[in-house]
């Protein structure tokens, strides 16, 4: 079980992650697509499903325009409430720093979250660079078996989402069935033509 600061003690009999065959590295899934296509909803459902299967999972909600942590569950069900901004603003991001700033859900033992809080935006904290985003992802892999990253739609201006798309083990690409989504893909897919984006890992 994830054992972050502020976490209440639970019975030891129910505190172990279900064993898996062989040792495997942490898996990172980035969820990306057009605005309003349900990225956050799907990210939350996947994270909750894994947690209910007793898999350690960290859900990262990268949106700094509309902080979603207050929208996905009542704040009184959370503890150790800190902001993703605290992590990304640090000159050097470590596993310990990430662990200290993870939000813990009181009722879902295997789930931890990171995201911006109500009233915050991209200017609330010091700006960060791709190097910090890479350190952040590396630290997440050390902390949990599964990492779900709810990416922002506008990757040209969202460093964390862009780095997540490049570094994730798989990318779930989502769109709505409407003209707005078609226009979105026509605008954004040309940005992903370079090999570094590894579009062959995109699940559509």
Per-segment meaning from a language model:
Residues 1-28, 77, 87-96, 183, ...:
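Acidic-aromatic/histidine active-site loop/patch
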Residues 17-19, 101, 159-161:
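Short beta-strand/turn micro-motifs at beta-sheet edges
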Residues 20-65, 69, 140:
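Walker A/P-loop phosphate-binding motif and the immediately C-terminal alpha-helix
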Residues 29, 58-60, 112-114, 170-172, ...:
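Hydrophobic/aromatic beta-strand patches that form the interior of the parallel beta-sheet core
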Residues 32, 63, 117, 152, ...:
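Anionic group-transfer/hydrolysis microenvironments
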Residues 53, 57-112:
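Phosphate-binding loop that captures ATP/GTP phosphates
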Residues 94-107, 112-157:
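Cytosolic-facing regulatory segments adjacent to core modules
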Residues 135, 142, 146, 151-204:
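Conserved catalytic-core segment of NTP-binding enzymes
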């Amino acid at each position: 079980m994830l054992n972050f600061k502020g976490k209440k003690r639970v019975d030891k009999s129910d505190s172990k992650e279900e064993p898996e065959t062989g040792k495997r590295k942490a898996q990172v899934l980035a969820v990306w697509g057009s605005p309003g296509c349900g990225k956050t909803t799907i990210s939350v459902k996947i994270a909750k499903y894994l947690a209910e299967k007793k898999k350690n999972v960290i859900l990262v909600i990268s949106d700094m325009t509309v902080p979603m942590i207050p929208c996905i569950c009542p704040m009184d069900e959370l503890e150790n409430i800190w902001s993703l901004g605290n992590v990304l603003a640090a000159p050097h991001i470590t596993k310990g720093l990430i662990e200290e700033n993870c939000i813990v859900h009181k009722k879902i033992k295997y789930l931890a979250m990171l995201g911006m809080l109500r009233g915050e935006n991209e200017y609330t904290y010091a700006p960060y660079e791709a190097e910090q985003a890479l350190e952040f992802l590396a630290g997440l892999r050390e902390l949990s078996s599964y990492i779900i990253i709810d990416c922002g739609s506008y990757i040209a201006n969202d460093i964390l989402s862009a780095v997540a798309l490049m570094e994730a083990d798989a990318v779930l690409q989502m769109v709505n069935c409407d003209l707005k989504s078609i226009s979105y893909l026509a605008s954004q897919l040309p940005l992903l033509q370079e090999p570094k984006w590894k579009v062959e890992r995109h699940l559509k």
